[in-house]
Design a protein with these regions (language model features):
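Short catalytic/metal-binding and nucleic-acid-binding patches
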Residues: 1-228
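Glycine-biased, small-residue-rich flexible motifs in mid-sequence functional cores and linkers
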Residues: 220-370
Length: 370
């Protein structure tokens, strides 16, 4: 299939995590949340990735990183004190019972899992904002202890002050932010999700190691034309040169038809075809899982917005690192809140997959003889 890269007018490099709130969540109520904060400009201020293999990868905190961890661990006590002070001042009962379930410091961002044990008088955002302010205060305090020549070498600082002056940073602006504006949160919504969150946190250093040492297969290209369609693409772009087989398990398939169809998809992969699809239904995901486990290739159509900092999740991440996956997306904007894929989007992705594979429709396969 013909494909080429076009100049793409959109630039996602500076996208932040601002306003990624769920419109359906009560952020002052009881709940568990995975929060993510990124340093302004994604500067690696918080630590350094160490280790000589994915299994041994870990992050060694910088001095600032240790202060961030200290501020994180202080959240429950600080919020209890603030609630007690407000109760005395307003003659009301204020509860801010918070438990920290885990965290992971990375060079340019921070993940934490926070448990609001009972309804609070303030939303989660105020708790996170207090944590961010505490970290920023520590950051500015550290800046003031560093001489001008050292700071002028910092990639995040721009100054017109002469290099040869010996004044301290007390005379310099400390308004340069530590964190980018806003943060991302993911509420726990189903049973078993907490363990997934914790595993994701602990897996972050390994994932960073894999991505740094497999930069080619995580390469993001914008404006990749496939037939009449234009996509943003991440992964093994060479997969576009290979014959494809569309995967779309129809609802109308009977049990035998579905099994025959899924087997036919795996057979196509074993014959060298790249499986292409949205892989939305559980049956389509089963086909993808078997194909990846056997070492075959997959082109995943997604509604995710692909940015320079995007990383595929779950089995797709490791498969992408092995060169088995290409992600394609036509998403051009960042939603103001998390949402699920719509039925119309599902239909569009399935149609695109069939067009890429060179077919107009997929007929149910004949069931195997009984």
């Amino acid at each position: 299939m013909e494909h080429e890269t076009h100049t793409h007018p959109r630039d996602y490099r500076s996208l932040s995590l601002t306003h990624r709130r769920s419109q359906y969540c009560n952020y002052a109520g009881r709940g568990i949340y995975l929060i993510t904060l990124c340093t302004e400009g994604r500067r690696p201020l918080l630590g350094e990735l160490c280790g000589d293999s994915p299994a041994r990868a870990h992050v060694r905190p910088s001095e600032l990183g240790r202060e961030v961890l200290r501020c994180w661990e202080a959240i429950p006590a600080i919020q209890r004190d603030l609630a007690a002070q407000k109760s005395l001042r307003t003659h009301t009962t204020c509860h801010r019972d918070i438990e920290l379930l885990g965290c992971q410091l990375m060079p340019d961002h921070f993940h934490g899992i926070i448990f609001i044990q009972q309804p609070m008088d303030i939303p989660l955002g105020q708790v996170v904002r207090g944590f961010m302010i505490g970290c920023t205060h520590a950051y500015h305090t550290m800046l003031k202890s560093v001489s001008i020549p050292t700071v002028l070498q910092h990639p995040g600082y721009r100054s017109t002050v002469g290099i040869h002056t010996d004044i301290r940073l007390a005379y310099l602006p400390t308004s340069h932010p530590l964190w980018e504006k806003g943060y991302h949160d993911r509420p726990l919504t189903r049973k078993g999700q907490l363990q997934t969150m914790i595993a994701y946190l602990h897996d972050n250093p390994r994932r960073l190691f894999v991505r740094r040492h497999s930069a080619r297969v995580f390469e993001l290209r914008r404006g990749v034309q496939v037939g009449a369609q234009v996509f943003d693409a991440m992964g093994n772009h060479a997969l576009l040169q290979r014959p494809m087989h569309a995967v779309h398990v129809r609802r109308r398939f009977s049990g035998p038809e579905r099994r025959a169809y899924m087997n036919a998809c795996i057979l196509a992969a074993r014959q060298g075809r790249v499986l292409v699809g949205a892989f939305i239904s559980e049956y389509e995901q089963q086909v993808r899982a078997v194909a990846l486990r056997e070492g075959h290739a997959v082109i995943q159509l997604t509604t995710d917005l692909l940015t320079d900092y995007y990383k595929p999740s779950g089995e797709l991440f490791d498969a992408c690192g092995r060169g088995q996956v290409l992600l394609l997306s036509q998403r051009t904007t960042l939603d103001s809140f998390s949402r699920r894929i719509t039925r119309a989007e599902c239909n569009t992705l399935n149609t695109l997959a069939e067009e890429m594979a060179g077919v107009n429709s997929l007929s149910p396969p004949h069931p195997p003889p009984q």
